[in-house]
Each structure stands twice: as C-alpha cells, then as structure tokens.
Amino acid sequence: MATTAASSLLKSSFAGSRLPSATRAPSSVVVSTGGAPRTAAISASISSSNPPYDLTSFKFSPIKESIVSREMTRRYMTDMITHADTDVVIVGAGSAGLSCAYELSKDPTVRVAIVEQSVSPGGGAWLGGQLFSAMVVRKPAHLFLDELGVAYDEAADDYVVVKHAALFTSTVMSAVLARPNVKLFNAVAVEDLIVKGGRVGGVVTNWALVSMNHDTQSCMDPNVMEAKVVVSSCGHDGPFGATGVKRLQDIGMIAAVPGMKALDMNAAEDAIVRLTREVVPGMIVTGMEVAEIDGAPRMGPTFGAMMISGQKAAHLALKALGRPNAVDGTIPKVSPALREEFVIASKDDEVVDA
C-alpha cells in the first residue's frame, strides 16, 4: 500500500522538483510461519530519509493583481447580464433546489439561475439529522444516487445510507455547476417577487448581507431577475425559510400558509413529492416548502423526497417552457428515480386559486 501511495504521488500534479532517489539496501527480517524461520527482504527505495520533492525553489507563474480583479468582475457581471432575463430561476440551493437544477440542466437550451442566500450552497444536506454525518435515502430515490455516481451502503431492502451527506451534496453541486447553462449566485437573497397580471415573472434580489441590514442602513435598493418560471425551494419555515410561499400569502395570491405538521416520515415524503406543483401561475414550489403551504407532516432526516421533488419540479418547469418533459410524456428518457405515479400526481387542477 505504501508503494502504491508513493507511486501515485510521483505521478500526480504535485509541482515540486523531484530529488534523486536515495535507495537503501534492502532490509532483512525474520518471519515466523510456524515452521522453520525464513528471511524476507523489504525494499526501502520509496521511503527514504529525504522527501521525494523539493519545494524550496517553488514559484507560481506571475500575475498582476488587477488581472485577478478584472477576471472576477467581468465574468460575474457577464453572468448578471445573461441571467437578468432567464428561463428558470431556482430560489434556494438545498437538496431539492440542486436536484431540480441538475434535471433542468440536461436540456442545454434552458438557462438556469440558482439564487442562494448562503455563502455555502447545500442547505441542510451537508449533514444528516442532529449534525450526524450519514444520509438516509429511502428507495426508489437511490436510483438518483446511482445516476450521480454517489456510493452508498445497501443497509436494508427499503433504504440506503450514504456514509456522509456531503458526498451527495458536493457531487450534485459539482455536476450542476459544470453545466454551461447554469449559474449559481450564492450570497444573494431574494427579497420579493416580480408579479405581472397575476403571474410570477421573476425575483427581486440583493446581496444577502445587505438584506440582513436593511434596518441599520438606507439607500440599498435591490436588483431584479426576470424569468419565465420561478422554482421556490426555500425550505421549511425560519428566518430565511419558506419565503416564497409566505410572500405569496402577503400579496394575496394564496389564502394561507398553514405550516408543516408534526413528524411522520412515511406520510411526509410521499406527500411532498405528490404535492410538488405550480402553486400559482409562473411559480413552482418544491422540497420542504411544499409541506409549509399544504400543512403536510415534516419528514425529519430523510432525503429521498427532496431529490424526487426537485426532479419533478424540473419537469414541471420544462412543461411550462414548452420543452420535452416527463409530466406529459414528451421526453423519451427519464431519470429512473422518477416513478410514474409521482409524475402523474401533478395535475393542472392542483394549481392553487389566486
């Protein structure tokens, strides 16, 4: 194992200057096998007193500080211009929002902007329950893990366990951000919705730190992002939670936000997927925010519903955009984790009356 590790290091992109090998004579040890002792030679050519690389003269390529500033600024501003009028805005980059973005981004013609108020996307999906590491995923959502290439322990017939929730979150986030049609705006908060003629048409944004300090500062007007579809995946109630549906109630587009009920895992996950829908024209609600608007039970530290709800929201958005989708069967190949009954659960008559 030591030889393999050393060989991998020597073949890596580690950018030091390799020193000459300091090969020592093989050592001899006596090994007892229960019978006559035998002598085994151990090579020490890999492990020497000198390190394999010398970094005393290491040097990066030179760069001007202004170039760094210009690269960051130009690219970010280009993204803001591109997504000032975009196809889909996803509000919240938790497990449901990222799953939605992953599914949407498979269509390279759909431009997707993800707005996340935290510096670090992922929501509550970096850990399991009570700050533990493992992520429990009920079947058949494990098929989504298979699609992503996330390893898991086949713990039982009904569920699987990912050894650390961060494995899922980092994998799906990396896959999403690698797609050229997706941009993540983290540390950006959504302060309001754009509504025209009874239809949600985008979001009102601001730097998250500015949003948190409106009471102490003035003259901090927001920015806007127009979108053909807004997907609200803001999570359950809290300081920054369920903000999409709460704003709909404030402006009279829905009657009430009853809040989620007490925990019932079996009822909750099915309900969240089944009730993921376009709640008002132009706005789809996914993830735990669904439980808030429908008074469904909370589900606790299981994550399968977040993944499938996010995927379903993506196909509802594709339908709204007039693109091939799984809801009306116009897409030839669907992620195997999307069960037919979950897709069929989304009906036009589920739209909440304004």
Curated annotation (Swiss-Prot):
Q: Which UniProt keywords apply?
A: Chloroplast, Iron, Metal-binding, NAD, Plastid, Thiamine biosynthesis, Transferase, Transit peptide
EC number(s) given by UniProt: 2.4.2.60
What is this enzyme's class at the first EC digit? transferase
Cofactor(s) needed: Fe cation
As given in the record, the signal peptide range reads none
Subcellular location, record wording: Plastid, Chloroplast
Which Gene Ontology biological process is one annotated for this entry? thiazole biosynthetic process
Which residues of the sequence carry a binding annotation for substrate? 96, 116-117, 124, 190, 221, 236, 288, 298-300
Q: Please state which protein family the record places this protein in.
A: Belongs to the THI4 family.
Under the subunit heading, UniProt states:
Homooctamer.
Descriptive protein name: Thiamine thiazole synthase 1, chloroplastic
Name of the gene:
THI1-1
